UniProtKB/Swiss-Prot annotation:
Lineage top rank: taxon: Bacteria
Keyword Repeat: yes
Residue stretches making up the PE domain: 4-94
Designated name of the protein: PE-PGRS family protein PE_PGRS3
Name of a matching Pfam family: PE
Keyword terms of this UniProt record: Cell outer membrane, Cell wall, Membrane, Repeat, Secreted, Virulence
Keyword presence, Manganese: no
A GO-annotated cellular component: extracellular region
Amino acid sequence: MSFVIAAPEVIAAAATDLASLGSSISAANAAAAANTTALIAAGADEVSTAIAALFGAHGQAYQALSAQAQAFHAQFVQALTSGGGAYAAAEAAAVSPLLDPINEFFLANTGRPLIGNGANGAPGTGANGGDGGWLIGNGGAGGSGAAGVNGGAGGNGGAGGLIGNGGAGGAGGVASSGIGGSGGAGGNAMLFGAGGAGGAGGGVVALTGGAGGAGGAGGNAGLLFGAAGVGGAGGFTNGSALGGAGGAGGAGGLFATGGVGGSGGAGSSGGAGGAGGAGGLFGAGGTGGHGGFADSSFGGVGGAGGAGGLFGAGGEGGSGGHSLVAGGDGGAGGNAGMLALGAAGGAGGIGGDGGTLTAGGIGGAGGAGGNAGLLFGSGGSGGAGGFGFADGGQGGPGGNAGTVFGSGGAGGNGGVGQGFAGGIGGAGGTPGLIGNGGNGGNGGASAVTGGNGGIGGTGVLIGNGGNGGSGGIGAGKAGVGGVSGLLLGLDGFNAPASTSPLHTLQQNVLNVVNEPFQTLTGRPLIGNGANGTPGTGADGGAGGWLFGNGANGTPGTGAAGGAGGWLFGNGGNGGHGATNTAATATGGAGGAGGILFGTGGNGGTGGIATGAGGIGGAGGAGGVSLLIGSGGTGGNGGNSIGVAGIGGAGGRGGDAGLLFGAAGTGGHGAAGGVPAGVGGAGGNGGLFANGGAGGAGGFNAAGGNGGNGGLFGTGGTGGAGTNFGAGGNGGNGGLFGAGGTGGAAGSGGSGITTGGGGHGGNAGLLSLGASGGAGGSGGASSLAGGAGGTGGNGALLFGFGGAGGAGGHGGAALTSIQQGGAGGAGGNGGLLFGSAGAGGAGGSGANALGAGTGGTGGDGGHAGVFGNGGDGGCRRVWRRYRRQRWCRRQRRADRQRRQRRQRRQSRGHARCRRHRRAAARRERTQRLAIAGRPATTRGVEGISCSPQMMP
């Protein structure tokens, strides 16, 4: 047996296959029994009857033999299964005596083992998770906080070893009337591994007062490979309590993207989304968290996008939370790294929708676009303003470009104001010495007063001024265009008349040069395209062949934005769809960016459906960038304000440039109508770019899926579900990239059920050390919390599994039935190298009438040949701890029995040696006596005796 080699996993798989085969054979035998054991005679004669009886007897004999074979098959499968378990137990028993002395030495001197996972903190104690082994080991999960008047803080996750993931932070304790406990911070990874997810903040049971706990910060990624941890979601509340703020995402490693910020908790005022984590040296900043839903006040502000690493792009700002009164503002996009070449600042987050048909409401303002790096790169696009039943939200300003080369970011479109005024378009960003000013955003439409267009950015040295945004339907005024650069360039649309004779001469000469190109090809050589004239439904004009921005599409008709200049230039924003009584009116698609450099335009907002049963228009798709540049943000879905209407879906984000640039974020699903619109999918990344984040869903709707990463890019983050909606799935990584994080589900507030978290995306097949995306957290609810999403699988050979999402908290309903959501299963590690993801913690049950039931913890994933299996979630932790403790006592007892047996054997051997020496002395004495020589008296066994006294 010393040369026997067995793989328990292979034996278990073979047993499963054999069991399935046996079931199939049994089903086939049962189906054939009726037709073979009781044959009907072909005729009434004796011969036919005898033949039928003969064949029936054969069939019965076959069934009897089949039953015996089935019993043997079941015994064989049972023996195979038990044999695999015996081999696994033998392997564990053989390794433990060798490893225990080494680990005991390191534990005594450093407080952590050399190899092994850290212990999980016990639930309800807020204890920190233990650190993993110095060489190989995952950090333990922090224990959840204790419930009370004020919830206790969750424990921090333990740090991972050189190879291993950080532990997840514990969830904050539920408060009966005070402040929910803050979630614990996720543990940091060391070299190869993913940072742990931050714990969710604790909720509040009382219907008045209090505040939800803040989510914990995500852990930092490993220095070389691994994903940064996701920030924990803020605690949800009921009644007049405030939602908790989401935790910040962890920092990325050398090549990793920063972690996604946690979503804000739902409440009377929504909690702010957590900030995205900073990118690693070559990594992009993380996406900011989605603001929390508010039922009686302001929606939560979206989290700011994380700053890019030294050579990375900025992260996208989080979307503002929806509200029944006033939507939250979108988060600002993160700035690109100082030395980033061609990387853009992050796009600003979309403002949240606000209000109801009867009470009115205000849409949230879009977030500002992030700035580019120090020398090269374009500014990020501003976020679109949110829809308001009274006033639309203002569009966010575009970010500024690098000082030497790059175009300013486009301003976000103003939000639609149904009852009073549309939102003002955002201002375009400032370009570099060479580059075009950003276009101003279009004003939002309104039945009363349309919003004014945004101001175009001004050129610096060589480049066109940005076009002023078109005014919204309802007598909105066009924005002022930007002035061109000092040496070369045309003024933007609606630019003020110049008083400089030199500038006037320059403009006239360029107009003469552009005339034949405009006549023959429909676009100038140098200059921006012309905005569509209101009332014509015309698409925006394309930018110049050399450089120029595409124009914005005509508002109110869903016209597409114009393409950017053929070489350099940003695409124009699509116009919003028309207001109608029944039929859908899709928003216009954003224009494509230039071939070399340029950002795609943002998609237009879908039209509003006012009639009964009307369907809001889908948001327009964001424009794509061709070589270097970012894709545009998808347009928001149109609202349906009539009876039994359906909200429009958000538009898909534009794809990033082939080489560099960020993919666009999907648009928001519409808030109005039942069902509401789902969020748009994020755009796909380019060669080195990450996929775009999915858009947030409308009220009770699911978030959009994250886009897939490029060849070396990370998958995009799934969009957050709103209220009861499920989170979107994270995008898959490129061939050499990591998987995206699943979106968080919306919190149910005072509702009954809630959605589950999105599943994490899988890492690319050939990525080295990349992690699967973490599953999204399940939403909190008054009764049953939503299930956490499953973590994505690591790369095929070398990679780490993503952590499962935490289950949502069960809230405070007037019933004793409380059930926390189940934690998501951890992802599998690579086949050869990599630790598996930890299962998500089950959500806590809380109740005004008594203690609820905690959710089941998720299963840990399977590790590779070199790596650790993932820890189970918190619900299973205590049983597992007891089992491990019993195993330690058993091993200690076995060791003591072996030592006693060895001592007995040693004493027996000593007695045998004494007897042999005594026999040898007797034989010598006898020989001497025969020879007539005197005998020597010796002591035998301590007794002085003569030869005559010998037996």
